[in-house]
């Protein structure tokens, strides 16, 4: 586990925690960017005339797209690039064949002002890291599984019966 920082699309720096594991089967990580103080962090940074008061919110809402863009620009052949969700927490998945023929499987989700970037890079010829990708779920402070009954454009209602 490593504490770090993450530079957002709009130039703000956010606290980040990176959980990682490496072995001969690949490199695995989950990066969690904490956007809970976005309004304060944006208000305290140096501004230009081009800055807009609500960029703190736009920075959070656009964080999935920005993280996906950062993964795409690393290079390699993108073989999968699509919207995804876990328990109706919206996100995005990418699969990339890297220059060395290793494969990167990435999933990005935004929940409760936290951006989750899960990445697994496995050597050429390895099986896809399906368990790693499919084991991610969101839990509340009491350890209960979170599943929503509707999407973000509607009022979110928590489905209390899923545990």
Residue ranges of model-derived segments:
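Surface-exposed amphipathic alpha-helical segments
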Residues: 1, 53, 57, 61-72, ...
């Amino acid at each position: 586990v490593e504490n770090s920082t993450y530079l957002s699309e709009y130039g703000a720096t956010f606290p980040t925690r990176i959980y990682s594991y490496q072995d001969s089967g690949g490199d695995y990580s989950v990066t969690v960017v904490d956007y809970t103080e976005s309004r304060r962090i944006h208000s305290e940074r140096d501004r230009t005339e081009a800055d807009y008061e609500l960029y703190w919110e736009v920075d959070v809402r656009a964080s999935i797209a920005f993280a996906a863009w950062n993964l795409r620009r690393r290079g390699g052949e993108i073989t999968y690039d699509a919207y995804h969700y876990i328990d109706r927490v919206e996100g995005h998945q990418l699969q990339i064949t890297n220059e060395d023929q290793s494969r990167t499987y990435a999933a990005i989700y935004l929940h409760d002002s936290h951006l989750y970037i899960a990445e697994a890079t496995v050597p050429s010829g390895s099986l896809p890291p399906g368990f790693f990708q499919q084991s991610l779920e969101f839990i509340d402070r009491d350890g209960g599984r979170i599943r929503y009954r509707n999407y973000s454009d509607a009022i979110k209602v928590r489905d209390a019966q899923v545990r």
